[in-house]
UniProtKB/Swiss-Prot annotation:
Protein name: Protein MucB
Entry's family note: Belongs to the DNA polymerase type-Y family.
GO molecular function per UniProt: damaged DNA binding; DNA-directed DNA polymerase activity
Additional comment: The mucAB operon is the plasmid-borne analog of the E.coli umuDC operon.
UmuC domain span: 2-187
Record-linked SUPFAM superfamilies: DNA/RNA polymerases (SSF56672)
GO cellular component, one term: cytosol
Stored PANTHER family: DNA REPAIR POLYMERASE UMUC / TRANSFERASE FAMILY MEMBER (PTHR11076), PROTEIN UMUC (PTHR11076:SF34)
Coiled coil: none
Pfam families, per database record: DUF4113, IMS, IMS_C
Species this chain originates from: Escherichia coli
């Protein structure tokens, strides 16, 4: 048996967690550069906001319903996600973090102590008590069925936020009323293709010929069908595979037109990518930098390009990665308004593969110690120590005009209470 714990409106819920005044108010969160709606709580959905709505188009709805709007605060969301995971891991020994707001749990052995429904309610209550985040919990024989149960838990209030189904008749009833689009991994194109075969509900898919499904759509959807029948095909991944690449990129708040500004942006991306690389305890040999204009602009000259450097010796040193990212100069073109840039790291290896006795190049002396100091200082506050090449006054930085404080990672952001 598997449980899926999914936070309701994660980003919006994180914003409400430190703002009691927003408890009964509609809340929505915007994408990068405050462009589109990417998260909504229940009241914001009820007011008519939809995922992907452009902010400028829905401002009348926002003003009419007094909806609280926030820029995306990824630092806060990542911190709250870690707290959410820690609570669940304190109650279950086998946990897989599927996304920032979703965790799978292996429920093996749980029924010896309590019912699955009681376990689901305990998970939900402990997460709420320790983080204020409200979750939906779905429990079933397979991960795909647990996803369906979670959908039911979040859709119908009468469930109390928990649906645990091991009864064939009740599962069939649920599958008969849910459209096939609710199945994990079934996208819009697959849904349309299935409809032409007469498969419109989840139950229709569960009853489909697995050989035909495999021939038409591939082995992954065939396994999904088997999961709908109660056969576990997707196991719990407690230790996700190591990343094959790291990408740090941003769309700019305003167009970048000078090489100096772009070099500062790329230096910042390279520094952040190197930090992520060290967090993964990996080393890289390939560093790429890319720049592009907006594909949606009819006024700007269209241009996109990428430059790549391959190192002789793998590194995780920010200085080396930043230097390699200066390959930007090879692809830079003047008189162009750039909308986005980024740095990608690839060809990863562990520390044991860093040295090659036949190479003349060797890592910088004291590199690891210096990077450890850099990371240690920056753990106490973002960008407490940074590279001069990143610049100070980044007018081109991502637009986040409604950014909330970093309540959980910055002492200066903790609200002050006064007792009189």
């Amino acid at each position: 048996m598997f449980a899926l714990i999914d936070v309701n409106g994660m980003y919006a819920s994180c914003e409400q967690a430190f703002r009691p005044d927003l408890a009964n108010r509609a809340v929505a969160v915007l994408s990068n550069n405050d462009g589109n709606i990417v998260a909504r709580n229940y009241l914001a959905k009820k007011a008519g906001l939809k995922m992907g709505d452009p902010y400028f188009k829905v401002r009348p709805i926002i003003e009419r319903h007094n909806i609280a709007i926030f820029s995306s605060n990824y630092t806060l969301y990542a911190s709250m996600s870690a707290r959410f995971a820690a609570v669940v891991e304190s109650l279950a020994s086998h946990v897989e973090q599927y996304s920032i707001d979703e965790l799978f749990v292996d429920c093996k052995g749980i029924t010896a102590a309590m019912s699955l429904d009681a376990f689901g309610r305990q998970l939900r209550e402990e997460v709420r008590r320790h983080t204020t985040l409200v979750c939906g919990v779905g429990i079933a024989r397979t991960k795909t069925l647990a996803k369906l149960c979670n959908h039911a838990a979040k859709t119908w209030p009468a469930t109390g936020g928990v649906v645990a189904l091991d009864d064939g008749a009740r599962l069939k009833k649920l599958m008969s009323i849910l459209p096939v689009a609710e199945v994990w991994g079934v996208g819009h194109r697959t849904e349309k293709a299935l409809a032409t075969m007469g498969i419109k509900t989840v139950l229709d898919l569960a009853r489909a010929d697995t050989r035909l499904i495999r021939k038409t759509f591939g082995v992954v959807l065939e396994r999904t069908v088997r999961e709908l029948r109660g056969e576990a095909c997707f196991s719990l991944e407690e230790n996700p595979p190591a990343k094959q690449q790291i990408v740090v990129s941003r769309s700019f708040g305003q167009r970048v037109e000078t090489l100096t500004d772009m070099q500062q942006a790329v230096t910042g991306f390279a520094a952040r990518a190197a930090e992520k690389l060290r967090n993964e305890r990996q080393y890289c040999r390939v560093i790429s930098v890319f720049i592009r204009t907006s594909p949606y602009s009819v006024r700007d000259t269209q241009y996109a390009n990428q430059a790549t450097e391959k190192l002789t010796v793998a590194t995780q040193d920010s200085r080396t990665i930043i230097q390699a990212a200066q390959a930007l100069a090879r692809i830079w073109r003047e008189d162009i308004a750039y909308a986005k840039a980024g740095v990608m790291l690839a060809d990863f290896s562990g520390k044991e593969a860093q040295l090659d006795l036949f190479d003349s190049a060797t890592p910088s002396a004291g590199s690891e110690a210096l990077m450890a100091v850099l990371d240690g200082i920056n753990r106490r506050g973002k960008n407490q120590l940074f590279f001069a090449g990143q610049g100070i006054d980044n007018s081109f930085a991502m637009r986040r005009q409604m950014l909330s404080p970093d309540y959980t990672t910055d002492w200066r952001s903790i609200p002050i209470a006064t007792i009189k």
